[in-house]
Amino acid sequence: MWWILLFLEWFVDWARGTFWYLFGRRSGLCKGTISPQGPLVVDQEKKDKVLQKEYASNEVPDNLDVIVIGSGIGGLTAAAVLARLGKKVLVLEQDKQAGGLCKTFTEKGFEFDCGFYYVGQLHENSFLKIALDLITDGQVHFAEQGSHVETVVIGKGPECKEYTIYNGKKQMEAHLKKQFPNDAKAVEEFFKIMKICSEKVRLLCMLKMVPLWFARFILRTGIADFISPILKYSRTSTSEVVKSLTSNQDLLTVFSKTFCGVPPKNSSCMIDALLLHHSKRGVYYPQGGASEIPYHIIQVLEKHGGKVLVNAPVSRVLVNEQQNAYGVAVKTGDEDIEIKASVVVSNAGVFTTFQKLLTPEIQADPQVQEYLKALKPGKGFFQVFAGFNATMEELGISSTDMRLYKGNNVDEMMEEYFASDKQDAPDNVPMMYLSFPSAKDPTSSTRFPGQSRMVIHTLVNPKWFEQWENVNEAERGEEYENYKMRFANHLFDWACVRFPQLKEKVALLHAVTPINMHGLGASYCSMSAEHNLERYQPLNIATIRCNTPVKNLYLSGQDIFTAGYSGALHGGFLCASTVMDRCLHIDLLLQQKKLKSKSVKKLE
């Protein structure tokens, strides 16, 4: 019996020591002050000098500590945080512009964001705002959008139904109850789940920071469930939870409106709850477009001795015989140039990192296979970028986003759609997301007078486009162009049902298929790993972490946490925490507490 007591005493002491080691030490990350916000930079040439700095061997800094592969938000966040903590960091981007899905591009005089729609939780002293200000020095000008965040439209005919989503701590719930008077209790219960998930989501960070054996121990013994019910919602589908509250399919569709490529029956309730909660305190859009975010992160990085270089495709991670990463090889013409650093961070995604940048021998490692088995490639995304020679007032559009569904049985619609024949698919798209970025950006009317822009987003099966996967865009031919425009025209016509004025004012219709993502190095033509229920099983949450079986090689970005801008940012902070071997989220939480205390004193 005595040995059990000794073991328990040792275990308690070990747990205390580990907790202090990971979560008790301060890093100094939040030391110093955020600069006063400067004027918005509208000079594109000035911005391009930061966002499009070409790779050249003489541009590579000496004595690098960290190399980051990929300049998406996850990679830039990790880079900026590590630079602030004294590391010399180089970010390598294979595209011609840094920023990942926060890039902007111009097509026939119309400016578009690649994949940014809005960001929530940026109210004063919020955790996300503090984190974002830290990596941008508070220089991004965000425009708060109206209280009407989104409209969900179910059905395509004259009998379609509309449900509106308004922000507000109490208003969002109250407004939904008005629209679903017979399901007020179900709405109330789902909002309780939202609160639990939003307050306890940091426990997921802890699962990824503590030793893996310990995370598995508290999960398998039920200790983690005793601490918080959030894991119950992470491993349970949205369909199962909502159907236990109501039989109303419309309400299920509204609660799962932002599903990330998977239907409600395969989607984690925790994720859908967090996504709805994300817009509860308002949504924001960067003035000047999404590229403002990487533009200012890069300047913070450069201020601390770092650099971001584009047109620098990494062909492999350099690994020695002891399976320690010590740098990367950059493909320049017919040769590979080796760049060395003590730490390598990959923001290229789990599949690209393990299956393209490492040797087959390392890929076969059981621990690597464990990562790959825990995740599946995400669905393919199809985008339509439309430009109009008319103002938002003339078109009758606003900053409110729209989510349109053919019907309310999303599970069934998705299953039928993805199983459909390639030739039938363009005419049977069951859902789409509609956004007007020009209506969200107050500077748009002065930067691009007389113009408006619309972005349509939907899901497709990458197999429908696989015959053109390895063909240069200029050589894909008429068949490819006609096929993708069948999707684009169908989606645009659907949008015109809602906004008839669009038809006669359209000046540009530009379609982007999943193979554009493949061309940017993404595996399986997807933006991130799939957000299915399997990914959010608690044991898989603990398994998918930033440190890898290859020593000194770390993962960052969406695949580590969740998809989307804030998910990638959290993935970046987790990665920096793992590299520094301390939980930097604690620094942010203490800074949040300090700022809130100051705000209270000002009011007294």
Swiss-Prot record:
**Gene3D superfamilies per UniProt:** FAD/NAD(P)-binding domain
Q: Which UniProt keywords apply?
A: FAD, Flavoprotein, NAD, NADP, Signal
The protein's superkingdom reads Eukaryota
Q: InterPro entries from the xrefs? A: Amino_oxidase, FAD/NAD-bd_sf, Retinol_saturase
Q: Which GO molecular function entries does the Swiss-Prot or TrEMBL record give?
A: oxidoreductase activity
Signal peptide range equals 1-17
- Give the family this protein belongs to, as stated in its UniProt record: Belongs to the carotenoid/retinoid oxidoreductase family. CrtISO subfamily.
Q: What is this protein called?
A: Inactive all-trans-retinol 13,14-reductase
Q: Which organism is it from?
A: Danio rerio (Zebrafish)
Designated gene of the protein: retsatl
